[in-house]
Amino acid sequence: MCIRDRSWQGTALVVDISGDISANVGMPNKIIFDPTAKDCVPYDVFASIDAAPDESERQERLEQLAYLLLPDKANDSEAGIFFAKNGRKMITAALICYYGMGWGFVEICEYFLGHDWRSLLNDIAQQKNKIANMYISSFVGASEQNTAGCKQAADDALKLFATNDKIKNALRKTASYEPSISPATLETNSIYIYIPDEKLKIYGDLLRIITAQSMEYFSSRPKEHTQMILFCLDEFASFGKLQITEALRKLRKRHIRIMVLTQSLADLDMIYGKDERKAMLGNFKFTVLLGCKDTETQEYFSKMIGD
């Protein structure tokens, strides 16, 4: 990988499955984010929200976080789309309400899962946060069965962050004098996210949050920041749906280089659909093919190369 080359002068955000990459890279200012370790330097989910210049921008970023937590799924059923859309409204209302009260991310997730939909919505309403209440006003008089389905969709999206002790430790709220990491850390340090191979499915939601927030940071990165940042995503299909195609089109101007590693096109098709996968591959300057077994993938790359 190019990050082993001493000529590389920038930093890197690397998803390092099983720790094979970080063990072989001697970059200075390297931070290993290991959510399985007790002494893990925590990742600050709310860093970009804290840095928002005004209340309106803060609200938008909280709404975007809700979308990252409960994204749309390709080829989802009509019922699935409904539950996800309205489950996001519940999450957004909770984030806006309880963030405004000074709660941490893990604390909000724990409270959300610890209450049924009626208790949760009543408590949010009682806080009299005008914006938060706008997101839940549509549930007044709605079918209780549908509302329960929306809450269940939201619960499933937040469960990892509310019930897994290792993840809760890795995302814990810190005092102002304690160290933590966020996408802005990449301006001075490289971050290697170590995920054991056997934990990849379990921690997939965590990876999606970190990588998606990093892309958001990159998209608004000040133009005077010219140091290169390598964005390396191993086992890419494990992240769920990211706005990667748009990032490939725009982030080069922000001095970001993206490297995506995946085992098959079929994995990408399941998440993004064929059309977006084709658009994605069309925006990579270089494609390295190490091997493929299924006929469709062989035909695709054969035509790309020119038979």
Stretch-by-stretch model annotation:
Residues 3-257, 272-274, 293:
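P-loop NTPase motor domains
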Residues 248-250, 254-307:
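Conserved ATP-driven motor cores of ASCE-family P-loop NTPases powering translocation/secretion/packaging/pilus
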